[in-house]
Amino acid sequence: MGNNVFDVLKERGYIKQTTHEEEIRDLINKDKITFYIGFDPTADSLHIGHFLPLMMMAHMQKAGHRPIALVGGGTVRIGDPSGKSEMRKMLSKEAIDKNVSSIKSQISRFIDFSDDKAILVDNADWLLNLNYLEFIREIGVHFSVNKMLTAECFKQRLEKGLSFLEFNYMLMQAYDFLCLNRKYGCVMELGGDDQWSNMLAGTDLIRREESKSAYAMTCTLLTNSEGNKMGKTVNGALWLDKDKTSPYEFYQYWRNVDDADVEKCLALLTFLPMDEVRRLAALEGNKINEAKKVLAYEVTKLIHGEDEAKKAEEASEALFGAGKDMSNVPTVNISKDDLGKGILDILVETKILPSKGEARRLIQQGGLSINEEKVTDINMAVTEDLFEENSIIIRRGKKSYNRIVIE
């Protein structure tokens, strides 16, 4: 690779903080290193917030470095307090195992694990059977409680209450880095910027225990031009699993980003060359929509594959452009027995909306249409006369569409 990958990551806007910028630049330019990123399996899918670290990981792998993807099957039993205002609910072992399995398969879509090019580990393998006394003697001795209490991840929790369980999280994450350093020669941790305190603890532990240098580099959080987190939809998070967020809904999210966010999203969420990113971002007026189409297609292709990206693009064209093929618009089926039911029941039973409260609110705010006719009555019945060619088109907000078909 001609460019130093550090400069590539910097130019594209990934890097937020580093422990030793010049040392890291030299290290990843001149040597091939092993680095890791951790993913806690708190849900059965990764979401768009995890995608930036995954992209960072992919850029590093393309430059010849070896990634370790660590799934936190052990640490998730504690719960990371970073950025959380209250304690997370504890997950059952079965739920954790299911989540770990799903996340491992998702990571494999972005990272090449063939021929030892990358390693996938679960920290449950070394955390579950830790001897508490040995751990406290070997690891705990290096941690100053006074210093830990000044860490950003604990500050906001001290007033509301921080359990001893969660207070241990920093030690566990630092210990992960030490284990990976000892077993695989891992010298760098990458992660979200909310992990900075935990990552510094790991580099410090390796320095004290192994008398070696270790490094940390954080990834910027995905925010819009106003500084708000991106990736929220009416149905919650923007998931990478197509059963939780359909490829069409995913595509439409990026198709509808603000003009001011196009360049940032193209740089962070695609592999398009930066010259092309700048060219697309410089388009003005209606032409910026072409850049948004490219963004939506490229990101959807990376997450869901080329076929799903094409289908989502065609569905979008059918609804907003000159296309007439509605077959790729997200479609749900109802039976003739469902005819006559209320609109709220239909919307929830078909999973177009997550709850009747959400559906009621949307209608009251004037945000729901059937066949481009605004729905004003929350008690309206869905009857056969509404259907044209056996289907109706539901529009939520300005640009979220679903088709309902009678089986």
Curated annotation (Swiss-Prot):
Location of the motif 'KMSKS' region: 229-233
Gene Ontology molecular function, alphabetical: ATP binding; RNA binding; tyrosine-tRNA ligase activity
Domain annotation S4 RNA-binding: ranges: 341-407
Listed GO CC annotations: cytosol
Reaction(s) this enzyme catalyzes, per UniProt: tRNA(Tyr) + L-tyrosine + ATP = L-tyrosyl-tRNA(Tyr) + AMP + diphosphate + H(+)
Keyword Methyltransferase: no
Compartments where located: Cytoplasm
Cross-referenced InterPro entries: aa-tRNA-synth_I_CS (IPR001412), aa-tRNA-synth_Ic (IPR002305), Rossmann-like_a/b/a_fold (IPR014729), S4_RNA-bd (IPR002942), S4_RNA-bd_sf (IPR036986), SYY-like_C (IPR054608), Tyr-tRNA-ligase (IPR002307), Tyr-tRNA-ligase_bac-type (IPR024088)
Any one Gene Ontology BP term: tyrosyl-tRNA aminoacylation
Pfam family, one: SYY_C-terminal
Binding site for L-tyrosine: Y36, Y169, Q173
Record EC number: 6.1.1.1
Record keywords: Aminoacyl-tRNA synthetase, ATP-binding, Cytoplasm, Ligase, Nucleotide-binding, Protein biosynthesis, RNA-binding
Intervals of motif 'HIGH' region: 41-50
Binding positions (ATP): K232
Cross-referenced PANTHER family: TYROSINE--TRNA LIGASE, MITOCHONDRIAL (PTHR11766:SF0), TYROSYL-TRNA SYNTHETASE (PTHR11766)
Function: Catalyzes the attachment of tyrosine to tRNA(Tyr) in a two-step reaction: tyrosine is first activated by ATP to form Tyr-AMP and then transferred to the acceptor end of tRNA(Tyr).
Family designation: Belongs to the class-I aminoacyl-tRNA synthetase family. TyrS type 1 subfamily.
Record's subunit section: Homodimer.
Protein name: Tyrosine--tRNA ligase
Organism of provenance: Clostridium tetani (strain Massachusetts / E88)
Gene: tyrS
